[in-house]
Amino acid sequence: MATIEVDLAPIVEGQEITLKWRGNPVFIRHRTTKEIELAKSVKMEELKDPIARSANVKEGEPATDENRVVGSKENFLVMMGVCTHLGCVPFGNQGDYGVVEGHATSGGWFCPCHGSHYDTAGRIRRGPAPENLFVPKYEYLTDTKILIG
């Protein structure tokens, strides 16, 4: 399986980067404290897909915010940037489930193809997508470097 090493140090809080891995986009977001708090405040029964969909936890684990990140590094969220409905690429900092301050939204994703909304942990909240955005296998090599794959 192909791997890719990523340096997280240049990604500032509130910023998201997109990179290509195995021919698909991967979103890496340095989440704000408010984005993390919002994700943790969601009750499991409110989720359309209650399964974590993460290669880093056992299959079937609940979609808690803790199960969507690796270890105690909750500020970085790594996910495949492919909508689980029909494979479009969602837009970041959009949708109805991010942190809204004034007229700006931070965190959250919106798929423009058919209207799926994902929250600040990449969990499907509304729209036709059946599952949460998938979290690929990754590990921390250092405090600021990860290996995906």
What are these regions (language model features)?
Residues 1-24:
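C-terminal segment of N-terminal export signals and the immediately downstream linker at the start
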Residues 8, 21, 29-30, 80, ...:
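Pocket-edge structural micro-motifs
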Residues 16, 29, 38, 121:
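Short acidic, gly/pro-rich beta-turn/loop elements at beta-sheet edges
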Residues 18, 27, 137:
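Short, surface-exposed charged micro-motifs
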Residues 26-29, 148:
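Short hydrophobic-aromatic micro-motifs
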Residues 30-49:
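Short, surface-exposed, low-complexity cationic segments
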Residues 44-149:
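Rieske [2Fe-2S] iron-sulfur-binding domain
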